[in-house]
Structures are given as structure tokens and as C-alpha cells.
Curated annotation (Swiss-Prot):
Name the record gives this protein: tRNA modification GTPase MnmE
The organism's taxonomic lineage, starting at the top: Bacteria, Pseudomonadati, Pseudomonadota, Gammaproteobacteria, Alteromonadales
Location in or out of the cell: Cytoplasm
InterPro entries associated with the record: G_TrmE, GTP-bd, GTP-bd_TrmE_N, GTPase_MnmE, MnmE_dom2, MnmE_helical, P-loop_NTPase, Small_GTP-bd
Binding site for (6S)-5-formyl-5,6,7,8-tetrahydrofolate: 26, 87, 127, 471
Cofactor: K(+)
TrmE-type G domain segment(s): 223-394
Residues engaged in binding GTP: 233-238, 252-258, 277-280, 347-350
GO annotations of cellular component type: cytosol
Length: 471
């Protein structure tokens, strides 16, 4: 990406609105030096903090003092934005900051910064790539230590490095494939060379690995959608109340009490979860209940995880060695998308004093399933479920963490994965080098969108407009 010259100077408050001990106003652009001369009466030394009065240069004698504080000057290109930057660090009173900002905006060719415009300047001047710019907003908005660590890793370039490595591998393979197409007269059939297939499969494996990491990063950022499903009167609403810590749902002994979707956002050790209670799944002639069941399946199909609840006081056979979980509820598993993870919740452990906690059950085909026995009524065993959900989300209590990812990153990685699989199929089935080369070109374009090497102006506007002003 080439650096884009900025002709406009922007200014905004860089600290949060409201009262505080310190308030910072940032100015970036070619007029920053003139603003410093007008407000400070001098241009501070580069990267040297100076304690100076902030003058109202719009007053009659131009010497009226608005505030006094620290002034910092960063000379282009060695600044956050890549432009000349001056920061005024004064007292954090809203009135004082508004007065100072008004004087700054009165200077020629200085305008109010839009949300995210400082970060956009940094991106356009190659100081940050797009994932790093997004990580700034994610770091500010992080709701847990895990999210903050992941956002910081993205800001430091961990995600970008993985993407760039995949792009380099694809470019290298493209060169090899296109050379084979351009020089068909060579005695060696390069397209039939096992090296191409081997390298292509290695890239596919790498993309799949990064995609899984990105899915974890997306869950940490956006929260995991957990849907509680099961037959009527299994205790789904009681579990929602137990997880949320409040009486969100009405609980009765009457089967079918819940007829619509109930949602509650909770945090477990700072990790965001969207818990969704649904109507009991059964055949029904009741029009309202049927609508509720349809909505339940809509939520199940959009879930990151499904908690399938059963009544442990009634259903014992599902844990026998010769049973499969799918045999227990075949009509449910027949409709459940394979990509959605499932945890079996055996509720009402208090009825027969069953042992609570986490166990694993292995189907006859070797598939392992997580099973948690609990009592939503007494709360016993609910902590085991919370720990299980944390594990699924990739919670790490130490100082390590993955990287932050957004929905658009997942889409680009999924598209890349699908195009690579198409290219592999065309190569193995038809030795179709031209199609493989085109699929590789599309893959490179998809990955370049993640870091911003190839990005539409509309996407940039959408991304940076979600930032706070001053960033």
C-alpha cells in the first residue's frame, strides 16, 4: 500500500469525555506546527515534554491563558499517524478542554476529527495494517483480561504475521503453477508434480488452523452464543436463571411454560456469553407454541454451542456403554448441524441425589461428548458448567492469549479455505492448472482484505467509524 498525503489537519479530545485529572487534545496534520506556534507561542522540541501555558490566540491580545500543561511534538513520519502531531495535555475539566479545542479549531485548515480518523491516518500512512487498527478499538472495548491480551497481540502484529505468511505461501505456489502453464513445452509436467499437491495441502492445513484460532478470537471479542435446548420441563429456564444469577425466566411445573426465546448476556471471569433459553421441543398443535419451537430451531442453527438438557431423574439409559447419544434423541440430532458443538446437561440431580460435575461419554463410533450433571434448582454442579464454557471459549488465566478476530476475518478465511479446496479438487481430478491459478489469486485477494492490502473504501469507512473520537 502506498502512503497517502494528508492535506487536512484534524483535532479532537483523545481522552474519555467527562471530568478527570488529565485531559488530552491531539492535533495531527500539516498545520500541527502552526497550531503549536499559535497556542504555545513556540514549537516544542521533538519528543521532549515541555510545561507551557496554553494561550487563547483568538483573544484580542492573544495572551490570555486558557490552561497550562504538557505539550508534546512528534515530527512526521515518526508519530502514531505518520503526520506531524502535537498533543496538549492539560487539566481534565470538560469546560477547559472545550475552550481549548474551540481555539484549535479556529485555526486555518483545522477540522474536527471523525471517529477513528487518527487511526485511519495511521493506516493510510502504513503505520498500521487494518487488523492492528481494529485491535486498537478492541483493546479499548475489551471486557476481560483475556480479551485485552488478545487485542494487544493483534495490535503487536501476531494476526497480521500469520496472514502475511499464508499470503507468501500462496504467492510462491502461484508462481510455480503459472510457470507450469506458461511453459507447457517443458519436458517435465510441473502440474503433475507432487510438490504442488503437497504444498497446496500444507497451505490448506495452515488456513484451517488459523481459521480455528480466529474463531476463538471472534468468540472472545463478540461473545459465544449458547442455546439451551431440550424437551419441555427439562429445566431450561431454571438453568438460564442459575447462569444469569437472576430470575430472568418464569419457572413452573407446567410443561411448555416458555413459548418464546429469552436471552441474557452474562460474563464468566470477564468472558462474554449470550445465553438463550428456548421453547421445549416437541410436536404441538398449539399455534403459539409451534411458533416458539420454530424460533428455537432458528436459534439452535445460529449457536456456537448447544446445551441439550435432559431430565436426569428420568433418563438414565443414555449413559450405558452400548448406547449412542444420538440414539437417545434421534429427531433432535437429525436436525442439528454437524458444525455446532454440543454439551449434554443432565439436570435435576437433586431429585435422586446424583453425583454432579463433568464427565465424558464415548459413543460406539469413538466420538466423545461432554456431559455435565447438575441441579439448576439448587445450583449444585453449575460451577462445573461455567468452567466447561470457559474452556470452550479458550479462556486462559495466565499471561498468554491468542489474537482478536472479527466476523469479516472469519468470512475471508472461510472463503480462502473453500477456494483452496476447489483448486485442489480441480488439480487432482482434471490437472486444471488455469483454474488452480485463478483460485489461488482469489485466495490471495481474500487474505489481503484482512490486513487491508486490498480493501474497498466502503469497508474502511465502516471499520473506522466504529472507533471513538480521538483514536
Amino acid at each position: 500500500m502506498t502512503s497517502i498525503s494528508q492535506t487536512t489537519t484534524i483535532a479532537a479530545q483523545a481522552t474519555a469525555p467527562g471530568r478527570g485529572g488529565v485531559g488530552i487534545i491531539r492535533v495531527s496534520g500539516p498545520e500541527a506546527k502552526n497550531v503549536a506556534q499559535a497556542i504555545l507561542g513556540k514549537l516544542p522540541e521533538v519528543r521532549k515534554a515541555e510545561y507551557l501555558p496554553f494561550l487563547d490566540c483568538t483573544s484580542t491580545d492573544k495572551t490570555q491563558v486558557l490552561d497550562q500543561g504538557i505539550a508534546l511534538y512528534f515530527k512526521a513520519p515518526n508519530s502514531f499517524t505518520g503526520e506531524d502531531v502535537i498533543e496538549f495535555q492539560g487539566h481534565g475539566g470538560p469546560v477547559i478542554l472545550d475552550m481549548l479545542l474551540k481555539v484549535i479549531l479556529a485555526q486555518p485548515k483545522v477540522i474536527m476529527a471523525k471517529p477513528g480518523e487518527f487511526s485511519e491516518q495511521a493506516f493510510l500512512n502504513d503505520k498500521l495494517d487494518l487488523t492492528q487498527a481494529e485491535a486498537i478499538a478492541d483493546l479499548i472495548n475489551s471486557s476481560s483480561e483475556q480479551a485485552a491480551r488478545s487485542a494487544l497481540h493483534s495490535l503487536q502484529g501476531d494476526f497480521s504475521k500469520l496472514v502475511n505468511e499464508m499470503v507468501e505461501s500462496i504467492i510462491h505456489l502461484r508462481m510455480y503453477v503459472e510457470a507450469a502453464i506458461d511453459f507447457p513445452e517443458e519436458e517435465i509436467d510441473f502440474l503433475a508434480d507432487k510438490k504442488i499437491v503437497t504444498d497446496l495441502k500444507a497451505i490448506i492445513s495452515r488456513v484451517e488452523d488459523v481459521r480455528k484460532q480466529a474463531q476463538q478470537g471472534s468468540i472472545i471479542r463478540e461473545g459465544m452464543r449458547v442455546v439451551i435446548a431440550g424437551r419441555p420441563n427439562a429445566g431450561k429456564s431454571s438453568l438460564l436463571n442459575a447462569l444469569s444469577g437472576k430470575q430472568t425466566a418464569i419457572v413452573t411445573d407446567i410443561a411448555g411454560t416458555t413459548r418464546d426465546v429469552l436471552a441474557e448476556q452474562i460474563h464468566i471471569d470477564g468472558m462474554p456469553l449470550h445465553i438463550i433459553d428456548t421453547a421445549g421441543l416437541r410436536d404441538s398443535d398449539d399455534v403459539v407454541e409451534k411458533i416458539g419451537i420454530e424460533r428455537a430451531w432458528q436459534e439452535i442453527n445460529q449457536a456456537d454451542r448447544v446445551l441439550l438438557m435432559v431430565d436426569a431423574s428420568e433418563d438414565h439409559s443414555i449413559l450405558e456403554d452400548d448406547q449412542d447419544i444420538k440414539d437417545f434423541y434421534p429427531e433432535f440430532f437429525a436436525k442439528l448441524p454437524e458444525k455446532i458443538g454440543l454439551t449434554l446437561i443432565r439436570n435435576k440431580a437433586d431429585v435422586n441425589d446424583a453425583k454432579t460435575g463433568f464427565t465424558e461419554f464415548t459413543d460406539t463410533d469413538g466420538t466423545q461428548h461432554a456431559i455435565i450433571t447438575l441441579s439448576a434448582k439448587t445450583g449444585k454442579g453449575v460451577d462445573s458448567l461455567k468452567e466447561h464454557l470457559k474452556t470452550i471459549m479458550g479462556y486462559q488465566g495466565g499471561t498468554e492469549g491468542g489474537f482478536m478476530a472479527r466476523r469479516r476475518h472469519l468470512v475471508a478465511l472461510e472463503n480462502t479455505h473453500q477456494h483452496l479446496l476447489t483448486g485442489l479438487d480441480q488439480l487432482e481430478s482434471y490437472v486444471a492448472g488455469e483454474i488452480l491459478a485463478e483460485e489461488l489469486r482469489i485466495c490471495q485477494q481474500e487474505l489481503d482484505q484482512i490486513t487491508g492490502e486490498f480493501t474497498s473504501d466502503d469497508l474502511l469507512g465502516k471499520i473506522f467509524s466504529s472507533f471513538c473520537i480521538g483514536k
